[in-house]
């Protein structure tokens, strides 16, 4: 049915031929062609009630949305605009963008923070105050967070955000309102999020049905047929976050580096205690204690179970203060720092004080030592992602920075009042090369919504639970024109994943999480393909054989059809002769996978999914006694 969707897209574009490409307020900006296109379609089809902007980080989702909001009155006089956003993003980018380019709509805007404990009450209170003659346009920024907060917990408890989700799914189309969801990563943790998002945008279209069978999408054709026009898809980088990507005129080159560091004997001892504690307390599935242990360890492992919280907190504070005092008036000599900046380690001619300090710091954290060395050797500015703030996280890392003489700013939950200003200073043209501020260390608070310019190295100290979060983190630094001020030879970003290792060769929590991410991505890639093939851009570019229409009366019927996955595609099991192989998608062998090569030269993954044909002259590397094909 994509031809039918194409006819409506064509109709919307014909209706909006004269829509200006510039947006003017106190400042003027000219929209990119893809921004203008999606705005014209969404505004040109009044009965298009909802749309997902699946745009990668840095291509201007906020700008596109503000343009749409500015032109809402082209189709109806009275609008109330409700923006559901994270608190950290209200001022920048949202208010700043609106004030610059569409100040006239500020009086119509209501900002509500969906992280607020009273979010539900605030939302419905504001809904009641809206004039009955007004139409409503709801914006959900970083909608994957909103969806995640609306999922029913494993214990069956319904979360407060769910009532807002239910209201929007029932009301937007019924009352002729509009809604835009924004995300660079619309699916983060589970396939259920896809179902939730689809049913928010197209209520009731995707009932409780199994989307996958043996990790294969049951009926992709049915989904694409029924979900046409669901989203706008602007994703220039469709590669895995672990793949290298060449640069372009607008985007910096990305190179991924896996930095494996060996934990000290002391760290390994604490790590094993953390693992045992997780098993005893039943929290091993979260791996928090082990993740913290791979990052930094005190001289002892403080037990938390069956203890007064105040007593436990006091012990942590004492350990921190003891460590801080041990570094008082200590720092590396200029000679040592010059050595580190060359990318070298201390030699036999180094001072006893430098060697002693380095040894003490490395014993407690091989990761922090590695990051500090990497920052000093970097030719430009750096970002460091550390999700933990206290105990073994940012609070400790900053002590390392001080000893290594690394200038820095912090973007985390404990710098709420200063972090926006600090990032602005970090991004100033005068600091393009990191002359004033070398590094920004950020927690999950900085994973979304902010932009960094002229970054050359990102260090990721802790694996997240999903590839989407990693994309958000890396996307802070690789954005449209983010390196325009950087010298041409430095328009690159090295992404360093710091992975801890045990001396006995057993996998660490870092390696476990890496495997989890790869497992999830198999299903997500198929769903992202559905988004791509149902997008306005794909349909407009690929469906040309349609009959023009002169009204939009059939749009609602077209997009309200239920999806039926009961008639599954016929999947025939075949016995194929061939050999088992190992393969990798990276020249640096960041991930090595089992596969199968048939006698006909076709290559399959471990689940039997066809990948591609074996090249005539394949690239082969030897690793740990295995022949690894590089595809």
Swiss-Prot record:
GO terms for cellular component: virion component. Changing residue 577 to K: In strain: Garcia-1966. Its EC number is 3.6.1.15. It comes from the Viruses. GO terms for molecular function: ATP binding; DNA binding; ribonucleoside triphosphate phosphatase activity. CDD domains: SF2_C. A motif (DEXH box) lies at residues 141-144. Keywords: ATP-binding, DNA-binding, Hydrolase, Late protein, Nucleotide-binding, Transcription, Virion. ATP binds at residues 55-62. GO terms for biological process: DNA-templated transcription. Residues 42-204 form the Helicase ATP-binding domain. It catalyses: a ribonucleoside 5'-triphosphate + H2O = a ribonucleoside 5'-diphosphate + phosphate + H(+). It holds the Pfam family NPHI_C. SMART domains: DEXDc, HELICc. Residues 367-532 form the Helicase C-terminal domain. Residues 457-524 are annotated as: Binding to the cap-specific mRNA (nucleoside-2'-O-)-methyltransferase. DNA-dependent ATPase that acts as a 5' to 3' translocase on single-stranded DNA and thereby plays a role in transcription termination of viral early genes. Uses forward translocation in concert with the viral RNA polymerase RAP94/OPG109 subunit and the capping enzyme/VTF to catalyze release of UUUUUNU-containing nascent RNA from the elongation complex. In addition, acts as a positive elongation factor to assist transcription through problematic sequences. Belongs to the helicase family. NPH I subfamily. Monomer. Interacts (via C-terminus) with RAP94/OPG109 (via N-terminus). Interacts with the cap-specific mRNA (nucleoside-2'-O-)-methyltransferase OPG102. This is Nucleoside triphosphatase I. It comes from Variola virus. The lineage of its organism: Viruses, Varidnaviria, Bamfordvirae, Nucleocytoviricota, Pokkesviricetes.
């Amino acid at each position: 049915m994509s031809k039918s969707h194409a006819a409506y897209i064509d109709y919307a574009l014909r209706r909006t031929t004269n829509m200006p490409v510039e947006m003017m307020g106190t400042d003027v900006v000219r929209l990119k062609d893809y921004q203008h296109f999606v705005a014209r379609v969404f505004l040109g089809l009044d009965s298009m009630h909802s749309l997902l902007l699946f745009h990668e980080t840095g291509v201007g989702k906020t700008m596109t949305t503000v343009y749409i909001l500015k032109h809402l009155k082209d189709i109806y006089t009275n609008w109330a605009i409700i923006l559901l956003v994270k608190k950290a993003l209200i001022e920048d980018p949202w208010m700043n963008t609106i004030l610059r380019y569409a100040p006239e709509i500020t009086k119509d805007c209501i900002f509500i923070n969906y992280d607020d404990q009273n979010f539900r009450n605030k939302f419905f209170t504001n809904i009641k105050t809206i004039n009955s003659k007004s139409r409503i346009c709801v914006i959900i920024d970083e909608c994957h967070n909103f969806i995640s907060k609306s999922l029913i917990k494993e214990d069956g408890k319904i979360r407060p955000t769910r009532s807002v989700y239910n209201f929007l799914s029932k009301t937007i189309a019924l009352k002729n309102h509009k809604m835009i969801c924004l995300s660079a990563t619309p699916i983060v943790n589970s396939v259920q999020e896809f179902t939730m998002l689809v049913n928010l945008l197209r209520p009731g279209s995707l009932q409780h049905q199994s989307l996958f069978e043996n990790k294969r999408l049951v009926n992709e054709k049915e989904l694409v047929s029924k979900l046409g026009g669901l989203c706008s898809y602007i994703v220039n980088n469709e590669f895995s976050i672990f793949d290298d990507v060449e640069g372009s005129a607008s985007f910096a080159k990305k190179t991924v580096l896996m930095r494996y560091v060996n934990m000290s004997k002391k760290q390994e001892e604490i790590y094993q205690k953390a693992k045992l504690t997780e098993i005893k307390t039943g929290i091993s599935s979260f791996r928090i204690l082990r993740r913290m242990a791979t990052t930094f360890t005190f001289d002892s492992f403080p037990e938390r179970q069956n203890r007064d919280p105040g007593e436990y907190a006091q012990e942590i504070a004492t350990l921190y203060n003891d460590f801080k005092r041990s570094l008082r008036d200590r720092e590396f000599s200029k000679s040592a720092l010059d050595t580190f900046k060359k990318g070298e380690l201390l030699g036999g001619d180094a001072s006893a004080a430098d060697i002693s300090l380095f040894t003490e710091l490395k014993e407690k954290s091989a990761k922090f030592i590695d990051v500090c060395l990497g920052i000093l050797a970097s030719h430009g500015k750096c970002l460091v992602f550390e999700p933990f703030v206290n105990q073994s996280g940012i609070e400790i890392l900053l002590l390392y920075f001080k000893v290594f003489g690394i200038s820095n700013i912090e973007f985390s939950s404990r710098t709420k009042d200063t972090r926006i200003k600090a990032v602005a200073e970090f991004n100033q043209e005068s600091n393009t090369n990191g002359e004033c501020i070398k590094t920004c260390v950020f927690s999950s608070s900085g994973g979304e919504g902010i932009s960094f310019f002229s970054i050359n190295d990102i260090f990721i100290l802790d694996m997240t639970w999903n590839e989407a979060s990693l994309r958000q983190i890396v996307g802070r630094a690789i954005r449209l024109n983010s390196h325009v001020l950087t010298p041409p030879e430095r328009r690159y970003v090295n992404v360093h994943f710091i992975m801890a290792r045990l001396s006995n060769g057993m996998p660490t929590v870092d390696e476990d999480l890496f495997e989890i991410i790869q497992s999830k991505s198999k299903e997500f890639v198929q769903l992202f393909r559905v988004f791509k093939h149902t997008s306005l851009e794909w349909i407009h570019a690929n469906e040309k054989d349609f009959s023009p229409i002169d009204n939009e009366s059939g749009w609602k019927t077209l997009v309200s059809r239920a999806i039926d996955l009961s008639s599954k595609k016929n999947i025939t099991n075949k016995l194929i002769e061939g050999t088992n192989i190992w393969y990798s998608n990276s020249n640096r062998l960041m991930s090595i996978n089992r596969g199968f090569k048939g006698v006909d030269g076709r290559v399959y993954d471990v689940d039997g999914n066809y990948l591609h044909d074996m090249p005539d002259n394949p690239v082969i590397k030897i690793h740990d006694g295995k022949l690894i094909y590089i595809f």
